[in-house]
Amino acid sequence: MKKIFTLFGGLVLFFILVNDNLFNNNILNLIERNYYKNNNENYHIVSNVEALNSNKYFKENLSDYVSITNNFYPKNKKELLNVYYTVLNNGWDKFSYYCDKSYTNCLKDIESLSNDNKELSFVNQLLNPYNSFSSIISNYNTDGRIDIEVKRKYTNKEIKKIDNELNNIINKLNINNIDSLKEKIRVFHDYIATINVYDSDKENGKSNYNSDKAIGTLFEGHSICSGYTDTLSLFLDKINLKNYKIANDEHTWNVVLINGDWYHIDLTWDDPITNTGENIIQYNYFLITTPELESKNEIEHNYSKEIYNFIK
């Protein structure tokens, strides 16, 4: 994790929040500079969340960690985090809000959200991958308005390409003709494991692949955990199963709700790197229960019960 801090004289605070993979390359760039009103023409300022439409990738939230809000005058950090979650989950690219006059630590808390990369990165896991962010720019104007601009992880062109490919795979694997939900998932699980290898070079910055995204998983044959989980999450959405991504400092995997029960899937660990280079598929982390996962007692699969309190 790296943090860059720059400060110039001027009128406006300019925060950049960056999310990459999990929490490894978050950057804070705090700049004071002039900020002209004509830059704000495309920003939404509303008093009620229903005044703006959600995009089609809005995801129901079951976590108590954050919630959709129609209060865009936050008075504390919890309410501030809810504003960011609401903007992200609704798919809004630009948005404006005001901190309540009593909220004297507002700017410090915005900076804190930038420094504490986990908070907004955890929010990303509760979103549809298409609504997740790669960076968030927050501009503070001297009239007290904070303008948010979101750079999404996936471009519209990539979304269209991924959606088409997932539909092609579903047809090729005859997923819709399989009765069992677990079997549908297994067939897709095996297909993705077969066409991919783990991109070990991504961690040292030498990779030439988009392995942290579904683009790398579906088209380049190289993935890391975020690429596997995004791809599986999008597939589970396609077959209308409620699902989320789970993350900690080191790793991310999927959970899916089937017939009222939550099951964990770690496609990354089911597609292991072998000494011989042989491509093998395992099922050690395929649709296992929370007690089964916890019985393995692995640090890489620890997760916050506060954030994922809905998983039993």
Question: Where would I find each of the regions flagged by the language model?
Answer:
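Sec-dependent N-terminal signal peptides of Gram-positive bacterial secreted proteins and lipoproteins
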Residues: 2-22
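Mature secreted bioactive peptide module from preproproteins
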Residues: 116-123, 129, 145-147, 201, ...
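Intrinsically disordered, low-complexity N-terminal segments that are enriched in acidic
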Residues: 23-149
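A short, highly charged nucleic-acid-interacting micro-segment common to nuclease
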Residues: 214-227
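Secondary-structure boundary elements
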Residues: 155-217
